[in-house]
Design a protein with these regions (language model features):
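Divalent metal-dependent catalytic cores for phosphoryl transfer on phosphate-bearing substrates
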Residues: 128
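Conserved RecA-like ASCE P-loop NTPase motor core of nucleic-acid helicases/translocases
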Residues: 119-123
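Peripheral, non-AAA+ core regions of ATP-driven protein-machinery
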Residues: 2-12, 16-81, 88-94, 101-111, ...
Length: 455
């Protein structure tokens, strides 16, 4: 019997070590090394794609025909946008996200909308009966999508060879294993080798493959982090399970922009595309309520208006509480320090709670002005006019710094009927405001924004 060799591999970056180490010297992450046992006789073997093809020959650059090949229309405007206009032939796409966020639902309802293509759906997690029940819940239309429950990579290639599909779905890559690797499914070695073999198959046969990958809730599993270096496109499906909205982001895309964003609404019968997220994210009944400010934000390349809510109250306990949902807590603490140092509001003995309505997580610095405005509104118990929105980054000296794509932000606010928008004064340079129906209020400092909002 061959002697087994133990290797410790970082589940975050793939760095290996003959012994366990607490901190990875390559990526700097702690407690990410896991033990992998490999056999010497198979350690250098790689799984083959199972498709016989001719050996590639070097050619000159001018001999290569680079005609634009039509992409596969997935009949999903949001997914097509994030992919860059559709699915590229021969591409390997990874859709990652936390368990239960809706990855399988997104992919299954997408393939059910493509009757003109022959699709093979490989499931390693659910039975065919479970998939049938899920499909009936998503749509009543019939589909010729082929479904097979299989976890062996070699058997999957046999099914592909027999069916010759136009598109292959594998749900999920963590459940697939190859016989050439003596390791359990979902391990770093299995995930890496199986995905590399699938990539080779996709390129050799010009067949697009969509992989679904899980991210552990603790973030300790290898999963999509390792796959990012292998696949062509990485899509991140994120959101809070307690809220209805889901966001599809492009993390890596060799065939399109990574600035695109798709927004969905989770319903009982599946995911619904949200073409105008601003109308859903804004509350319709906050008249007379303090602590509410509307921000014109941009996620990816899409502008939309979001509702920033703040609650400021006297600290009941010894230490004041600070809490932020959907916004960086450290940045909120910085903005509170700016309010106290530059504007003169004493909030050191106040509890401050901040919430981005709708369960969204926003990283756009242009919502700084709305965060400060909502906090001031709650602290003074004074309402901000409902037809007023704002966009601006706040600096440490209390200045309102310019933001990008200001025309798109103003246009979104004007489209939804807002009458006023506060913007950085620097953004006003070179802007033609004569055709705008919305009133532009330029501000340079937080004090000016305070006077414009509260008099």
């Amino acid at each position: 019997m061959a002697k087994e060799k133990t290797v410790y591999v970082c589940s975050n970056c793939g760095q290996d070590s003959p012994k366990w180490v607490g901190k990875c010297p390559s990526c700097g992450m702690w407690n990410t090394y896991v033990e992998e046992v490999v056999r010497k006789e198979v350690v250098n073997k790689r799984p083959v794609s199972g498709i016989e093809t001719a050996k590639a020959k070097p050619v000159t650059l001018h001999e290569i025909v680079a005609d634009d090949e039509p992409r596969i229309d997935l009949h999903d405007a949001e997914l097509n946008r994030v992919l860059g206009g559709g699915l590229v032939q021969g591409s390997l796409v990874l859709i990652g996200g936390e368990p239960g966020i809706g990855k399988s639902t997104l992919v299954l309802q997408t393939v059910l909308r493509i009757p003109e293509k022959r699709i093979l759906y490989v499931s390693g997690e659910e039975s065919t009966r479970q998939l049938k029940l899920r499909a009936d819940r998503l749509t009543s239309a019939s589909s010729d999508c082929l479904i097979v429950c299989e976890t062996s990579l070699e058997q999957i290639y046999v099914h592909i060879k027999n069916t010759r599909p136009d598109l292959v779905i594998i749900d999920s890559i963590q459940t697939i294993s190859t016989e050439t690797i003596d390791s359990s499914p979902g391990s770093l070695v299995q995930v890496r080798e199986c995905s590399a073999s699938i990539l080779k198959f996709a390129k050799e046969t010009n067949t697009p493959v969509i992989l679904i990958g899980h991210i552990n809730k603790e973030g300790s599993i290898a999963g999509p982090k390792v796959l990012e270096h292998i696949v062509d496109t990485v899509l991140q499906f994120e959101g809070d399970q307690h809220y209805m909205y889901r966001i599809l982001r492009s993390i890596k895309n060799r065939f399109g922009s990574t600035a695109e964003l798709g927004i969905y609404e989770m319903r009982q019968n599946g995911l619904r595309q949200v073409s105008n997220p601003s109308e859903l994210l804004l509350s319709q009944d906050h008249d007379g309520m303090s602590g509410v400010a509307i921000a014109s934000a941009i996620e990816g390349v899409r502008p939309f208006l979001i509702e920033t809510q703040a609650l400021v109250s006297s600290a009941v306990y010894g230490n004041p509480q600070r809490s932020a949902t959907g916004f960086d807590l450290r940045r909120m603490n910085m903005l509170l320090a700016v309010l106290e140092k530059r504007v003169g509001f004493k909030l050191a003995q106040k509890d401050v709670f901040l919430n981005i309505a709708g369960g969204l997580k926003v990283n756009d610095p242009a919502i700084d002005l709305s965060v400060i405005s909502a906090i001031l509104s709650s602290n003074m118990d004074t309402e901000i006019e409902r037809d007023t929105c704002m966009a601006g980054e706040v600096g440490l000296s209390g200045e309102i710094r310019p933001v990008n794509r200001i025309e798109q932000r103003i246009g979104e606010a004007e489209k939804l009927g807002f009458k006023q928008i506060l913007i950085p004064k620097h953004n006003l340079q070179g802007m033609d405001t004569s055709k705008l129906k919305i009133e532009i209020i330029p501000v340079r400092k937080v004090e000016e924004a305070f006077r414009a909002l509260f008099g």
